[in-house]
Curated annotation (Swiss-Prot):
Residues annotated as catalytic: H280 (proton acceptor)
Highest taxon above the source species: Eukaryota
Quaternary context: Homodimer.
Residues engaged in binding substrate: R185, R191, N224, R255
Official protein name in the record: Malate dehydrogenase [NADP], chloroplastic
Protein family per UniProt: Belongs to the LDH/MDH superfamily. MDH type 2 family.
CDD domains: MDH_chloroplast-like (cd01338)
Catalytic activity: (S)-malate + NADP(+) = oxaloacetate + NADPH + H(+)
Regulation: Chloroplast NADP-MDH is activated upon illumination. In order to be enzymatically active, disulfide bridges on the protein must be reduced by thioredoxin which receives electrons from ferredoxin and the electron transport system of photosynthesis.
Gene source species: Mesembryanthemum crystallinum
Entry's EC annotation: 1.1.1.82
Gene name per UniProt: MDH1
Disulfide bonding pattern of the chain: C75-C80, C416-C428
Length: 441
């Protein structure tokens, strides 16, 4: 972002910092020490300003970067303060702070998700976090607005917030990367075009993660088409275990549980062992064969098998489109909830006998699904961020046929993006028909 674009707001930023320092000087108690300093205003091709405070409140001169020097992500407001707490006053029960990077951080989904993360709802009431928010030049003002709201919310577990537009800065040392940002499919855009446009975004983000993120970073890809975007991302991050990459199919799982509960006349917490197989598209396979209601097989509880085979899957696929008709926009809050659910499924032990759905790397899978894909399958976790595939599932011809169709689609998407995964020239022979979910067009 050019300096000229940020200059009008700099004095306002400085004034805010001066006011903050004045307020702090009168309110800080003796037992907490703050190291406060006014940082020079860096100028670079990546742009940005830094905000902090110092007792003398002298504006620093504009710093001109050396050739090749790059900017850093911006700490924001109160999060620019350096805390120096006495050892005996530190919270003894808190865990070591974890760093979470979020792309598309100025969007509606993130606007719901970030506050769940900051509140402790996702990682727990004893887990402090640092949020690193990735936006674009166009969304940078909105990104500052998000940071302001986080600042005003006074979350004790939120210890640091930084904002920026360069993934190589924002992904530095990230232990979780929630990749939400992607271009939506516009009018007249072919599916192959969307695969290419968003694939380039996730190829670049994969390279950035590979270069600067934690070697054990956990990555959840939300931007669509999420399965193939996750595959592209992991192929561009060879230093990170492929097993650490997930495509989000949890919203599909949650929707399937809701519809089964409605049909059975029970509350949705009675539905377990729900699997979404395959692609996050209209070829997805909500598995009612292995799912249970109150511990019993779904087909035992719901006698209307025609409904299960002919209507149930279509209802899940069309749920997003139905929401748009009512709400006027695609789902944001429920998507944020599903991201939170997906993370919680990895950081808390899976209840005995249950499992959850996630689109993960297929190498070594026990189901006979083609390898080298990102395919939604049933998983269990011990709560350590890792997972294992569930082996004790059953298949019938109906389920296998539909899984095969989704597999063929993902193989075609892989061929269509071969130029982004280092596997040669792309050949787009996508199956006939439009399989994008109605809520994502």
């Amino acid at each position: 972002m050019a300096v000229a674009e940020l200059s009008p707001s700099y004095k306002t930023q400085l004034k805010t910092c001066q006011q903050l320092s004045s307020s702090l000087s009168t309110r800080l108690s003796d037992h907490r020490k703050f190291s406060l300093r006014l940082l020079p205003r860096p100028v670079s091709v990546r742009g940005g300003i830094r905000c902090s405070v110092a007792p003398n409140q002298v504006q620093a001169p504009v710093a001109v970067p050396a050739e090749g020097q790059t900017g850093k992500p911006e700490c924001y407001g109160i999060f620019c303060l350096t805390y120096d707490l006495k050892a005996e006053e530190e919270t003894k029960t808190w865990k070591k702070m974890i760093t979470i990077a979020v792309s598309g951080a100025a969007g509606m989904i993130s606007n719901h998700l970030l506050f769940k993360l900051a509140s402790g709802e996702v990682f727990g009431p004893d887990q402090p976090i640092a949020l690193k928010l990735l936006g674009s030049e166009r969304s940078f003002n909105a990104l500052e607005g998000v940071a302001m709201e986080l600042e005003d919310s006074l979350y004790p577990l939120l210890r640091a917030v930084s904002i920026g537009i360069d993934p190589y800065d924002i992904f530095q040392d990230a232990e979780w990367a929630l990749l939400i940002g992607a271009k939506p499919r516009g009018p007249g855009m072919e599916r192959a075009d969307l695969l290419d446009i968003n694939g380039q975004i996730f190829a670049e983000q994969g390279k950035a993660l590979n270069a600067v993120a934690s070697r054990n970073v956990k990555v959840i890809v939300v931007g669509n088409p999420c399965n193939t975007n996750a595959l592209i991302c992991l192929k561009n991050a060879p230093n990170i275990p492929a097993k650490n990459f997930h495509g989000l199919t949890r919203l599909d799982e949650n929707r399937a549980k809701c519809q089964l509960a409605l049909k059975a006349g029970v509350f949705y917490d009675k539905v377990s062992n729900m699997t979404i197989w395959g692609n996050h598209s209209t070829t997805q396979v909500p598995d009612f064969l292995n799912a249970k209601i109150d511990g019993l097989p779904v087909k035992t509880v719901i006698k209307d098998h025609k409904w299960l085979e002919e209507e149930f899957t279509v209802m899940i696929q069309k749920r997003g489109g139905a929401l748009i008709q009512k709400w006027g926009r695609s789902s944001a809050a429920s998507t944020a909830v599903s991201i939170a659910d997906a993370i919680k499924s990895l950081v808390t032990p899976t209840p005995e006998g249950d499992w959850f759905s996630s689109a993960v790397y297929t190498n070594g899978n026990p189901y006979g699904i083609a390898e080298d894909l990102v395919f939604s399958m049933p998983c269990r976790s011990k709560g350590d961020g890792d997972y294992e595939l569930v082996k004790d599932v059953v298949f019938d011809d109906y389920l296998r046929q539909r899984i095969k169709k989704s597999e063929e689609e993902l193989l075609a998407e892989k061929r269509c993006t071969a130029h982004l995964t280092g596997e040669g020239v792309a050949v787009c022979d996508l199956p006939a028909g439009d399989t994008m979910l109605p809520g994502e067009m």
